[in-house]
Amino acid sequence: MRASSPFLTAVPLALLALVAASACGGEPDAVADPLLHREAGYVGSAACRACHEDQHASWAVTHHSTMTQRPSAATVLGHFDGATVAQGKDSARPFRDGERFLMELQVGGVARTAEVELLVGSRRYQQYFERRTLRDGASFFRLPILWHVELHRWLPVDSVFLGPDADGLGGHAAEWNTNCILCHNTGPRPGLLGADEPARLQEGNRFDSHVAELGIACESCHGPGERHVATARSVAKGEAHAVVHPDELDKERAVAVCGQCHGARLPEPPRRAREWFTTGPTFRPGEKLVDHVKPIERGTPVRGGGDPEAFALRFWGDGTPRLTAYEYQGVVASQCYTKGELTCTSCHAMHDGDPKGQLRPDLVGNQLCTQCHEDIGKDVAAHTRHAVDGAGSSCLACHMPKVVFGVADIHRSHRIDNPDPARDGEAGRPHACTLCHVDKSLPWAADAMRRWWGERYRAPQQRFDGAPLDLADAAANLFAGDAAARAVAAVALGEPTATFAPDHAVAVRAWLAVTMGDGWPSVRLLARRSLLAVEQRVGALGVGARAQTVDHLAGVEQRGKDVFGLLDAIAAAARDRSAPAPASIALLGRDYRVDLARVVKLTDLQGRNLIAIGE
C-alpha cells in the first residue's frame, strides 16, 4: 500500500551539518548499509538519540522499530533448523550456513536456494525476503513461508490471508520495492529505473531502492529532522527549527500522520504514482493527507482493470472497514472525529505503555472514552444496563467491536459507532452485542436494545447472508458468512467475553469443530484456537487434547477424518457428562450430534469472493 507529501525543507549546508554533529554528539549514520539514504532532509534515529535518549529508548522497544530489519541471529525469529515445510508438491527448507539464513525451495517444479536479505514483521509473524538482480537494478521478493510467532511454527504465506487452500507455495508473491517499502520503512524511495518509460508497473521493472531507515522510525511521525538537528544548539536557546509533534496538530493533520500508513490509499492525482515509485510518497507529517492521496473507500473505483469489487470487499456493507490498514478511514468516519476532536493520540501513545497496543498508560479501560464522555463515566451501568465491571460495560466492546481481519487475527474496528442490529444484519457486519452473547440472534438483540434505548432499534428484515433470522448471529456468520465474517465469528466464540447458556455449551464447541474443516486455512486456524480457549475457560468436555492434534494445514482428506473424529468425541463427552440438552436452534440433535444437513444448507450461502488485502 502507499503513503504521501513534502514538509520540511533540507538545509544543505555543510557547516550546519558539522554544528549538528558536534552539538548533539551525533554518531556516524549506519550508511554502510547500501539501502540507506540521507536525502530530502532525513538524518536517521541515531541523530535523534543523541539528544532525546529517553524517547529513542521507548521507541526502540516498539514493533514499529523492528518492522523491517536485516537478518541476524538477534533479529531472525524463525527456526532455520533444516526442517522441511511442504504444501502440495512444493516445499521450503529453511537452514543456516554460518551467519547466512537460507531457504532451499522446490516451487512449481523449480529447485533453487534463496538467501534471506530482509525481514518484515516481529510481533505476530515474520516474513522473509530475498534480493534478485534484474539487469541494472534489484528487487526484494517475499519467500513463500513465514514464521508465526504465537504458534511457533512455519506457515505458507498464503495461508494467513483470506483465501482458500493453495496447491503449492507459489501464491501471494510480493515485491518489497513496490509495496512493503512504502509503509514499513522511513523515508522510502523505491527508485524505479526508467521512469520516463510508460509508467505502468509490471513484473520486470528495475529498482534502485533506498530508505532513510529500515523500520518505522522518528522521522516517519515527526518529519525529516535535518533542520532541527542543524539548529539544535542555536545561539538563542529554544529556537531550534521545530519538528512536527502530532499531538500539537489540528485533528485533520494529526490523524494524517498515522493515516499515511494506517489508511490504505491511492496517489492523487493518479499521475503522482510515477513519483511515488521513484522518489517516494509526497506526504510529510504536518500536512493534510488528502492533499496527496485518495483514501480507499467502499465505493472507490479500481484503477487499471482487475476485480471491480476488490476495494468494496475490504469493507462491510455499511462502509465500515474490515481489514487492518484502514484505521484512518474508520476514525474519520466516527462522530468522535467529525463532531469532536478525536485523534489517534487521544488513545494511543507512541512512547509509553505496552508496545503491543501502545495505548496511553494513564487511561485504563473505559477511561479512554470517559475522558471525553464524562457524564457517562459517572454512572456507566445506567448507560450500558450491564454490570459496571463486566464486558457488557466495556466501551470498546460495544462501540469498537472486533470485526477487522489482519495479520492472521481479528482486531478492533476504529470506526466508533453504536451497535445497530438492523444495520449490521442487512450489511453482513457482525453485531457487537452478539459478539459477546454468542448464542443469541439479531432479533433478540433488537428486542433488548429497543427495551433499553428506544424504538429506533429494530430487527433486520433479512440477513445479508440469507441465513434464518432466528439462528444465533455467531453461528450464521460462522457457516453462512464470507471469509471475513467467518473469521470474526470464529474468534468471538473463543473470547474471554463470550457468554452462552448451558444449552449451547456443547453447540459452541461443535460449531468450532465443524469450522476446523472450513475451506479457508486462516479461518480454520482461528477456529482451532478458539475451541482450545473454550475448553480451558469453560468447564472442559475433555476434548482439548483431541483438538490439539488437529493440524489446520493437513490435507482435505485428513482434515475430514480429524473433524468427524472431533465431533464424535464432543458428542460422546457430552453424553458421558450428561450435558444440558442442546437448544432447538443450536444446530445439534438430542444426541449432541451436529445437524449436518442444516449446516450444509448454511454453507451453501457463503460468499466465495477473494478478499484481497493488498499485501
Stretches with model-predicted labels:
Residues 1-13:
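Bacterial N-terminal signal peptides that target proteins for export
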Residues 586-615:
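Eukaryotic intrinsically disordered, low-complexity regulatory tails and linkers enriched
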Residues 26-32, 36-39, 46, 54-123, ...:
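Primarily the internal scaffold of c-type cytochrome electron-transfer domains
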Residues 492-495, 530-533, 601, 609:
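Core register positions within helices of long alpha-helical scaffolds
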Residues 159-162, 173-179:
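A gly/proline- and charged-residue-enriched helix-loop-helix capping module
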Residues 517-523:
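Short coil/turn segments at helix-helix junctions and helix-capping linkers
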Residues 21-23:
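C-terminal motif of bacterial Sec signal peptides marking the signal peptidase cleavage site
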Residues 469-475, 507-514:
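Alpha-helical solenoid scaffolds in eukaryotic proteins
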